[in-house]
């Protein structure tokens, strides 16, 4: 009797390891790693128009190109 139980357990374990066993829905939430948005160099235009505040700050920090209201880039 113990041999039968052991064989059934091993067979079911082998099926699960091969992906042939229970194929239910994934029950845990999928966690996405936090990735900082990367601003491309193309976003740092010379006119400061059409870019977001975040992109403007990034351009100022990384490249020294800082937007000022109605003045365009300085630096």
UniProtKB/Swiss-Prot annotation:
Q: What is its main location?
A: cytoplasm
Q: Which GO terms describe its biological process?
A: defense response to bacterium; defense response to fungus; killing of cells of another organism
GO cellular component entries: cytoplasm
InterPro entries named in the record:
Penaeidin
Per UniProt, what is one Pfam family of this protein? Penaeidin
Could you say which protein family the record assigns here? Belongs to the penaeidin family.
* Protein name (record): Penaeidin-3k
Q: Native species of this protein?
A: Penaeus setiferus
């Amino acid at each position: 009797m113990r041999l039968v139980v052991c064989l059934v357990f091993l067979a079911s374990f082998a099926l699960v390891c091969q992906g042939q066993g229970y194929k239910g829905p994934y029950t845990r939430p999928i966690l996405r790693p936090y990735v900082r948005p990367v601003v491309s160099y193309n976003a740092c235009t010379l006119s400061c128009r059409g870019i977001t505040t975040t992109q403007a700050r990034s351009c100022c920090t990384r490249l020294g190109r800082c937007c000022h209201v109605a003045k365009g880039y300085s630096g």
